[in-house]
Amino acid sequence: MTRRLRRKNIIGGRVAEARKAFNPPLTQDALSGRLARLGIQLDRAAIAKIENNSRHVLDYELKAFSDALGVGVNWLLGDEKK
């Protein structure tokens, strides 16, 4: 079941892709700081788990990732181009 879930969960990969698209790339710690300024407490380890698809993303976290990374929620969900 985990293997099946991983194929369907694209948010983690999109978070990593958006984070690395910054110049210079955002570190997971820097992203954690951006999220904290938005009121979301996720440390580097939690972000790593999300990017590795071993932790689910809650709806309010999805919105915060969108704001912190400057990408649309739909893009994070795989529905549109960056």
Where are these regions (language model features)?
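A short, Lys/Arg-rich alpha-helix, primarily the initiator
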Residues: M1-L26, A30, N74
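DNA major-groove recognition helix of helix-turn-helix
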Residues: L35, E51, E61, L77-E80
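Residue-level recognition of specific faces of alpha-helices
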Residues: A46-K49, H56, W75
